[in-house]
Amino acid sequence: MIGVLGGMGPLATVDFFNKVLKATSARGDSDHVPMLIQSDPRIAPRPEAILGEGRSPLPELLAGRNRLIAAGAMALVMPCNTAHFWYPELLKGCSVPFLSIVDASIKELAHLAEDGSKIGIIATRATLAAQIFDLTLVRLG
């Protein structure tokens, strides 16, 4: 069962869920991927926290992660690019695989882009300021 740490914003969670449904070759309802979705839009705003203008959402993210695991999630995803600023902290002590939207995006780009290609990132000001994608690009080579 996949645990979805979502609600930041809710439409990103809905978009992720729809993409999983469309990518599943299900012949009937019971053939779909089981998911637990936590959609909590009350989690502290990520952009403000990254820019030093608000409180950190990390305690709420950790609580959501732990709730999903306690409810039976066997793997986790978080369909919010900006929240991946806290991804390293969310991995600490995590007892199930936690997939990174940033790692997955960059690995997919590596297959699609030709050597020497320029790639642009459309993201929030905070995501760009935090260099979430830049740091992962360096880490993954």
Where are the regions a protein language model picked out?
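Non-catalytic structural scaffold of enzyme domains
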Residues: 1-141
